[in-house]
Amino acid sequence: MKYLFYNIEYSGIDLSGNRYTLFSKEAFTDKDKPELVNMKFVEANFYFKDDTILNVISKEGVYNNKTLDMEFKKDVIAKYGESKLVADKANYSNSNSFLEISENVVVTDQKGTVHADKLLFDIKKQNLNIISLNNNKINAKINLK
């Protein structure tokens, strides 16, 4: 049995002490796995301690209301400062304090554009790893001005 909801909002603080909000126009849960909230037309905002904001939108997503983990799927768009990211998938792991972006990743900002297979952002350490799979190259156009 499935339970259908409209215009839902979750908010909280992750294990690193950062605040977040999560919105969905439509969502459903399954009786057998009530902790998993399957969502459509998703928007999340992460408010970091340094006063920066990460905004993520996607056509679909899954929120685990026990672990606070989030998965974003289909037409993922993220904005962080002057940077814009597009990808097919993004996973936020609250328990491991990281954000993994994968599949057709393109990051664009004032300094240039990067195409990669996967990005791993460690929230606690505030560092980014850019990964290429299957011996693919990471394509980057960087403006050094």
Predicted regions span which residues?
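Mature-chain termini and adjacent capping regions
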Residues: M1-K145
